[in-house]
Swiss-Prot record:
One of its GO terms (biological process) is ribosomal small subunit assembly. Signal peptide: none annotated. GO terms for cellular component: cytosol. It is found in: Cytoplasm. Gene3D superfamilies: Ribosome maturation factor RimP, C-terminal domain (2.30.30.180), RimP-like superfamily, N-terminal (3.30.300.70). Belongs to the RimP family. It comes from the Bacteria. This is Ribosome maturation factor RimP. HAMAP family: RimP. Keywords: Cytoplasm, Ribosome biogenesis. Coiled coil: none annotated.
Length: 151
């Protein structure tokens, strides 16, 4: 997890300069190779051209830094249908969306919530859960959250 944070910290100023948001970073081994996956977004949406451009820019910064000592594959992508929600900004942006939230500890004997994201205020998320109705969850209690696509 520390490596992911190092990657985010290195690339955050570059992303800001390029007017994009880093939505999520993953760094893991796949079929014996290290893979750095970086999900990006911007207000007007991400194109293939954006991904190509950011791949070149991020790749150069990662190669110049000493963060990734082993060889790696760099993948740049849009967040997709099941976009991860990690920041307060992302929760606020997707108020009204169907959301899946998993918590570190049970809230009302429940750790998994699915429903409409109603609000984010004072470090608390309010969701209209399909099972228990309106539930408030501390931002710090969220293990994982993502948009749930209606397909």
């Amino acid at each position: 997890m520390r490596k992911v944070q190092e990657i985010e910290d290195l690339l955050a100023p570059v992303a800001a300069r390029e007017k994009i948001e880093i939505v999520d970073v993953q760094y893991s081994k796949k079929a014996g190779d290290w893979v750095a996956r970086i999900f990006i977004d911007k207000d007007s949406g991400v194109t293939i051209s954006d991904c190509e451009n950011i791949s070149c820019i991020f790749g150069a910064f990662l190669d110049e830094s000493d963060i990734l000592k082993d060889s790696y594959v760099l993948e740049i992508s849009s967040p997709g249908f099941k976009r991860v929600l990690k920041s307060e900004k992302s929760f606020r942006r997707f108020i009204g969306s169907k959301t899946r939230i998993r918590t570190f500890k049970p809230i009302n004997n429940q750790r998994n919530f699915l429903g409409t994201l109603l609000n984010f205020d004072d470090g608390r998320i309010k969701i209209n859960d399909v099972t228990n109705g309106v539930v408030e969850i501390e931002f710090s209690d969220i293990r994982k959250a993502n948009i749930e696509a209606d397909i």
